[in-house]
C-alpha cells in the first residue's frame, strides 16, 4: 500500500512538472509571436523602455507612427477612396421610394353644380317635357340621377400615395465620367499628400537626430577642452608656487577655465533642448532620458552619396510636382464637367405608382397602382452663353495650373542644384577641417612641449588649445553639415 501511494505521488509530481514546462513553452512561444508581429513603433517603444540606444531608423519609425499630420493625411486618403466609390455609383441605376398623404378641405368634383342639379332632378325635368305625371316614375328617375352624381364623386379629401421609381442615366453629357475621373485624381492626390507628409516627417526627424548627435560630440569636445585648461591651470599654479610663473599667468588661465565651464553649460542646455524636440517628434515624453546610437562613436560616420543631383528624371519623384500635375488634370476634367451641363441629357425611368382613392376604379377607397416606363430627355437651348463663359473660365484655370507646374519645375531644378552644391561644399569643408584638426593637434603637442621646456608662455599654450578646439568644432560642424545636406538633397529629389 505504501509503495502504491509513493507511485501515485511521483506520478502527480511528474504531471505537474510537465504541465509547468508546457505552460513555460507556451508563454515563450506567445512572447516570440508578439515580438514577430510587433510594429516598428512598438519595438522602438520597447527599446526606449529597456534603456537601449536609439538608431536613426528607430527614431524614424517612431516619428512616422506618432506624427499627427501624417495620421490626418491617412484619414484624408481613406476619405478620398470613399468618395471615389461614391462617384462609381452614379453609373448604376438608383431606386427611390416615396409616400405621402394629403388631407383637403374640399374634394375634386368632376361635375359642376348645374350638372349635378340636372341629374338629381332628371325625373321631374323629363316628366315636364314628356308629359309624364306619374310621381313614382319621376322619383325613380330622380333617384337614378342621384346615383349618377354619386358615381362621379371622387371622394378624395383624404388621398394616399406611394411610389417606387428606378432611374438609369443613359447619357449625361460626360458629366459622370468627368466626376469619376476627378474622384480618381483626388484619391491619387490624397496618397501623394500622405507621401509628402511622410517625407517632411523624415526630413525633420533626420535633422533633429543629427543635431542631437552633433551637440553630444560638441559636449564631449567641450569637456575635453575643459580638462586641457584645467590641467594647464594646475601646472601654472604649481609653477607659481615654485616661483617660475607670475600670478597674472594664473589669472589668465583661470579665466580660460571659467570660459570652458560656461561653454560646457551652454552645450548641455542646447543638448537637453534638442533631445526634448526629438522626444516630442518621436511621441515620447519630453523628459525621457534617451541615448542615440551615433552618440557613442568618436566621429560621425560620413557615407557616400546615395542620390545624384544631376538625375533630372528623378525630379518627378517630388510629391509637389505630382500634386500640381494632378491639379492640371483636375482642371481639365472640370472643363468637361462644365461643358456637360449644357449638353443633352437622357434618363431612363421606370416604377410603380399606387394611390388611394383608386383612380382606375371609380375613385373607390382602396389602394391600386400601375407600372410605368419612360424616357426623360433634357436639351438646353438658350442660356445667354452661360455655358460658354463657364467653359472658358475652366480652360483659364487649366492654363494657370500649367503655368504653376512649369514654374515649380524650374524652382525644383534650382533647389536640387543648390542642395547638390551645398553638399559638395560641405564635403570640401570636411576635408579642410580634417586637415586643420591634424595641424591643430600637432600645434598643441608642440606648444605643450615648448611650455614644459620653458620656451613658450601660457598664452601660447592657451592659443594652441583654443585653435585645437575650434578645429575640432569645425570638423563636427562639417560632418553634421554633410548629413543634413544629404537629407536635403534626398528631399529635393524626392528619394526620402
What is the meaning of each model-derived region?
Residues 20-109, 286, 292-329, 409:
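Bacterial Sec-pathway N-terminal export signals of envelope proteins
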Residues 1-24:
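Bacterial Sec-dependent N-terminal signal peptides
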Residues 40-51, 98-164, 295-304, 336, ...:
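Small/polar, glycine/serine/threonine/aspartate-rich low-complexity segments that form flexible
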Residues 26, 54-58, 82-84, 192-313, ...:
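Periplasmic alpha-helical coiled-coil/stalk elements that build and connect Gram-negative outer-membrane
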Residues 32, 259-284, 437-495:
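Short segments within alpha-helical structural elements
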Amino acid at each position: 500500500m505504501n509503495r502504491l501511494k509513493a507511485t501515485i505521488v511521483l506520478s502527480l509530481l511528474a504531471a505537474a512538472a510537465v504541465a509547468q514546462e508546457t505552460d513555460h513553452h507556451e508563454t515563450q512561444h506567445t512572447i516570440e509571436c508578439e515580438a514577430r508581429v510587433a510594429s516598428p513603433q512598438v519595438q522602438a517603444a520597447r527599446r526606449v523602455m529597456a534603456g537601449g540606444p536609439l538608431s536613426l531608423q528607430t527614431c524614424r519609425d517612431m516619428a512616422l507612427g506618432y506624427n499627427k499630420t501624417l495620421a490626418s493625411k491617412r484619414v484624408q486618403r481613406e476619405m478620398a477612396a470613399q468618395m471615389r466609390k461614391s462617384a462609381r455609383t452614379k453609373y448604376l441605376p438608383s431606386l427611390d421610394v416615396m409616400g405621402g398623404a394629403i388631407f383637403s378641405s374640399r374634394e375634386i368634383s368632376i361635375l359642376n353644380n348645374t350638372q349635378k342639379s340636372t341629374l338629381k332632378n332628371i325625373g321631374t325635368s323629363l316628366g315636364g317635357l314628356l308629359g309624364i305625371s306619374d310621381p313614382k316614375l319621376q322619383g325613380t328617375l330622380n333617384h337614378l340621377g342621384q346615383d349618377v352624381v354619386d358615381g362621379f364623386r371622387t371622394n378624395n379629401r383624404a388621398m394616399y400615395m406611394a411610389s417606387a421609381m428606378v432611374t438609369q442615366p443613359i447619357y449625361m453629357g460626360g458629366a459622370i465620367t468627368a466626376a469619376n475621373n476627378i474622384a480618381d485624381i483626388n484619391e491619387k492626390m490624397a496618397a501623394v499628400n500622405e507621401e509628402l507628409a511622410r517625407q517632411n516627417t523624415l526630413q525633420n526627424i533626420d535633422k533633429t537626430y543629427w543635431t542631437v548627435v552633433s551637440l553630444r560630440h560638441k559636449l564631449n569636445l567641450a569637456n575635453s577642452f575643459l580638462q586641457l585648461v584645467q590641467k594647464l591651470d594646475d601646472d601654472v599654479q604649481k609653477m607659481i608656487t615654485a616661483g617660475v610663473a607670475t600670478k597674472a599667468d594664473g589669472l589668465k588661465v583661470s579665466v580660460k577655465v571659467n570660459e570652458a565651464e560656461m561653454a560646457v553649460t551652454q552645450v548641455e542646455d542646447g543638448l537637453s533642448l534638442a533631445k526634448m524636440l526629438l522626444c516630442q517628434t518621436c511621441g515620447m515624453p519630453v523628459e525621457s532620458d534617451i541615448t542615440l546610437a551615433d552618440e557613442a562613436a568618436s566621429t560621425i560616420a560620413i557615407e557616400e552619396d546615395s542620390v545624384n543631383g544631376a538625375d533630372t528624371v528623378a525630379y518627378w519623384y517630388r510629391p509637389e510636382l505630382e500634386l500640381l500635375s494632378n491639379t492640371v488634370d483636375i482642371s481639365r476634367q472640370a472643363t468637361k464637367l462644365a461643358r456637360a451641363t449644357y449638353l443633352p441629357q437622357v434618363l431612363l425611368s421606370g416604377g410603380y405608382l399606387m394611390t388611394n382613392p383608386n383612380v382606375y376604379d371609380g375613385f373607390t377607397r382602396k389602394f391600386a397602382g400601375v407600372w410605368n416606363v419612360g424616357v426623360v430627355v433634357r436639351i438646353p437651348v438658350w442660356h445667354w452663353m452661360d455655358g460658354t463663359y463657364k467653359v472658358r473660365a475652366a480652360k483659364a484655370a487649366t492654363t494657370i495650373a500649367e503655368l504653376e507646374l512649369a514654374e515649380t519645375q524650374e524652382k525644383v531644378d534650382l533647389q536640387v542644384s543648390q542642395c547638390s552644391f551645398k553638399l559638395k561644399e560641405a564635403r570640401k569643408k570636411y576635408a579642410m577641417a580634417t586637415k586643420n584638426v591634424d595641424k591643430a593637434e600637432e600645434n598643441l603637442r608642440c606648444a605643450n612641449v615648448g611650455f614644459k621646456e620653458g620656451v613658450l608662455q601660457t598664452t601660447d599654450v592657451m592659443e594652441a588649445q583654443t585653435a585645437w578646439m575650434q578645429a575640432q568644432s569645425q570638423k563636427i560642424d562639417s560632418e553634421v553639415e554633410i548629413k543634413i545636406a544629404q537629407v536635403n538633397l534626398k528631399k529635393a529629389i524626392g528619394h526620402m
